[in-house]
């Protein structure tokens, strides 16, 4: 994964976005070259999959997001710049993806795994707000990737649910990505 380290401390230092997204993309390029091409006294590992960040969708209140303390739009811009830069540098020799979504928990109890029947209710708990945020972030991200034809060779997500729920979420994700032309 390209991005920060996971911080469980109260005060977090590595969850703010980079100040210069282009510079960060170049740093990512150098990390990849270090691990795959031996650049800077590095290695020659056969690492093909490179994920851009981790859980930028963690919470609708960016100050409570333990992985990305910035707006969704800022993450989208980071992904846009980094994915294009890495594709230019490496072509199809690496797989570019992300964003390690917090998951599709809204799908868990839904009748329709296509995701087309989901609405947002008026009275929401903090968890409900987060779950809706996960979905909205996903929809916006996929829309950006498809509209702008950005590199997305794979999509990652997490779930800490029961196996049957995970299967429903996986089916939803696969169907949605296929419908968007990314399957």
Regions found by a protein language model. Give the residues of each.
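Substrate-binding cleft and catalytic face of glycoside hydrolase catalytic domains
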Residues: 1-152, 156-162
């Amino acid at each position: 994964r390209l991005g920060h380290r996971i911080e469980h401390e109260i005060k977090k230092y590595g969850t703010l976005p980079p100040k210069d997204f282009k510079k960060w993309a170049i740093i990512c390029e150098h990390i990849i070259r270090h691990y795959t091409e031996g650049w800077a006294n590095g290695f020659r590992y056969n690492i093909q999959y490179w994920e851009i960040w981790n859980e930028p969708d963690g919470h609708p209140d960016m100050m409570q997001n333990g992985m990305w303390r910035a707006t969704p739009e800022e993450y989208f811009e980071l992904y846009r710049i980094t994915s294009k830069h890495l594709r230019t540098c490496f072509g199809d020799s690496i797989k570019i993806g992300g964003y390690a979504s917090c998951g599709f928990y809204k799908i868990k109890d839904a009748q329709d795994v296509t995701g087309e029947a989901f609405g947002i209710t008026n009275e929401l708990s903090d968890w409900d707000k987060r779950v809706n945020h996960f979905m909205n972030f996903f929809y916006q991200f996929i829309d950006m990737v498809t509209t702008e034809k950005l590199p997305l060779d794979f999509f990652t997500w997490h779930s800490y649910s029961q196996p049957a729920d995970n299967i429903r979420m996986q089916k939803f994700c696969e169907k949605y990505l296929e419908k968007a032309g990314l399957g």
